[in-house]
UniProtKB/Swiss-Prot annotation:
The keyword Transmembrane applies. It is a multi-pass membrane protein. It comes from Caenorhabditis elegans. The chain crosses the membrane at residues 31-51, 69-89, 115-135, 139-159, 184-204, 223-243, 263-283, 291-311, 318-338, 346-366, 401-421. This is Putative ammonium transporter 1. GO terms for biological process: ammonium homeostasis; ammonium transmembrane transport. Keywords: Ammonia transport, Membrane, Transmembrane, Transmembrane helix, Transport.
């Protein structure tokens, strides 16, 4: 016979088992949510790859793609070994405001979903810079700044702003004032950081050859990318990724209200991007009479960047102002870069630094408890409206201080590194390599080798003729000299100079012969012309 005591014990055991299963279930659900969002954010690397590949000339496509590949590889190793420890490792009392110093190589740490989610954020911050230095950056420079950002710059910033011990997160508490750094999904810590470094890198590296030929001209010669479809596809992938970037920053899905916050963040993100795109498109059409696709994509991304800071607590109507501000700031910063004669092929500074800075400010202006709400309370004569106004402006001021700290830290660390690379001749490729393209010289792999294309019965015969025109050339100087066997391949730009719009082969005018870099290419062009006349 079961006694009351035994029955109570069994009930307690059953309750404990149910609690254990419930806790485990919630942990698994949250882990799955974080990993799922992180996978989508990781796919943003593909978006950056397409966006940047389409925006560069065909002769540099392989170069930009391998940089995007290695971004993921370098960042995971650096963040695993050092970055996580500096960002979220336990801190001693003396340095806890500025940096963590434990859990290197994830020693003693097992919250892998959280680590994976933060890693993809780190990779995003690092990959932003590659667009600003495209088509002229030495490979060692890319590896260097990618490593420094993922292992040092970004982790320290996240410790400042996203840990309870960080000085930005602690803020200032004095009387009625209680400020804390407000950046839900990284407008400042990810995008303002990456955008600021993009500005520095593009400035120190200098413009691409031919970008600003006339020092007296405030405009620039447009250097066209080779694939609008690639750029558009990359933009769509990034738009998709931003929904997970911001929605996933809730970091859980099992608590009451989590699903609502995730949905709100995603809705605000796409709304901000939409308003930014439309305001920019309208202004651009008014100024130039053209409905631009490429720049509208950038404006949309700028709006999504701006939404990162306050998307979890803004009302959807507020996205009108977030998006409009982001679109106009992108327009202003893009024109400023041209006026300063700083060549940023992907507008990385305008998109990420401009959008990121506005995001930090707007989260303290039009989010709940922001300046706009405090002013409305003051006008309506609400109780304690004066205190609310003081708190709102104090929070806005703290956001400004934190934004300047992010810029100062990012530039302060990278400036001496870029300076050393420039002084040692490792910052930028030679003029010869830049003019002829990085793909062949640096990687030995053309993105679009003409020998890979075939559409007729005479391809084999023509391939044999082309092979006969192969030549050896010497590239580089001193210890960097290389003797390379060059087949008469041409970039897409050079091929376009041979064909007219109807697809017929036309004679080469004298002034365009400079497009061909060796005698083999000239021979091939002449051969194609001679065959066409038969």
């Amino acid at each position: 016979m079961t006694t009351p005591t035994n029955f109570t014990t069994e009930i307690d055991k059953l309750h404990a088992e149910i609690t254990r299963l419930e806790t485990g279930f919630y942990e698994n659900v949250n882990s799955f949510f974080l990993c799922s969002m992180a996978l989508i954010i990781f796919f943003m690397q593909c978006g950056f790859a397409y966006l940047e590949a389409g925006a560069v000339r065909s002769k540099n496509t392989t170069n930009i793609l391998i940089k995007n590949l290695l971004d993921s590889c370098i960042c995971i190793i650096g963040y695993w070994a050092i970055g996580w420890a500096l960002a979220y490792g336990d801190s001693g009392e003396g340095v806890n405001l500025f940096v963590g110093h434990s859990q290197f190589f994830l020693s003693g740490f097992s919250d892998y979903p959280r680590f994976f989610f933060q890693y993809v954020f780190s990779a995003t911050a690092a990959t932003i810079v590659s667009g600003a230095v495209a088509e002229r950056c030495e490979f060692i420079t890319y590896v260097t700044y990618c490593t420094v950002i993922s292992t040092f710059i970004y982790p320290v910033l996240t410790h400042w702003g996203w840990t309870e011990n960080g000085w930005m997160a602690k803020g200032i508490t004095s009387g009625i004032i209680d400020t804390k750094y407000d950046d839900f999904a990284g407008s400042g810590l990810v995008h303002l950081c990456g955008g600021s470094i993009s500005f520095l890198a593009a400035w120190i590296m200098g413009p691409r050859i031919g970008k600003f030929p006339d020092d007296e001209d405030d405009e620039s010669d447009e250097i066209l990318g080779h694939s609008v479809p690639f750029t558009a596809l990359g933009g769509f992938i990034l738009m998709f990724g931003f929904l997970a970037f911001n929605g996933g920053s809730v970091a859980s899905i099992s608590h009451a209200g989590d699903g609502h916050t995730v949905a709100l963040a995603m809705i605000n993100t796409i709304l901000s991007g939409a308003f930014a795109a439309l305001i920019y498109l309208g202004v651009h059409y008014y100024q130039h009479g053209k409905w631009t696709l490429l720049l509208t994509i950038n404006a949309c991304l700028s709006g999504m960047v701006a939404a990162c800071a306050g998307c979890n607590k803004m009302e959807p109507w507020a996205c009108i102002w977030v998006g409009l501000g982001a679109g106009l700031i992108y327009l202003a910063f893009s024109k400023l870069m041209i006026r300063l004669k700083i060549d940023d092929p992907l507008d990385a500074f305008a998109v990420h630094a401009g959008g990121g800075f506005w995001g930090l400010m707007s989260s303290s202006i039009i989010s709940h408890g922001g300046v706009a709400y405090a002013l409305a309370d003051a006008v309506s004569g609400a109780k304690n409206s004066g205190d609310h106004l003081t708190q709102a402006f104090a929070q806005l001021g703290w956001q400004m201080i934190c934004a300047l700290a992010i810029i100062a830290w990012s530039l302060g660390v990278m400036l001496p590194i870029f300076w050393i690379l420039k002084k040692t001749g490792k910052l930028r490729v030679s003029e010869e390599v830049e003019i002829n393209g990085l793909d062949v010289f640096k990687h030995g792999e053309m993105a679009y080798p003409l020998r890979a294309y075939g559409h007729g019965w005479h391809d084999f015969e023509r391939a044999n003729k082309i092979q006969a025109f192969s030549a050896k050339i010497t590239v580089g100087e001193g210890k960097n000299t290389r003797i390379m066997k060059i087949h008469p391949e041409m970039s897409i730009e050079q091929l376009a100079s041979v064909y007219d719009r109807s697809g017929n082969i036309i004679p080469m005018p004298k002034k365009s012969r400079t497009l061909f870099t060796n005698s083999a290419e000239r021979k091939m062009s002449q051969m194609m012309y001679d065959e066409n006349k038969m």
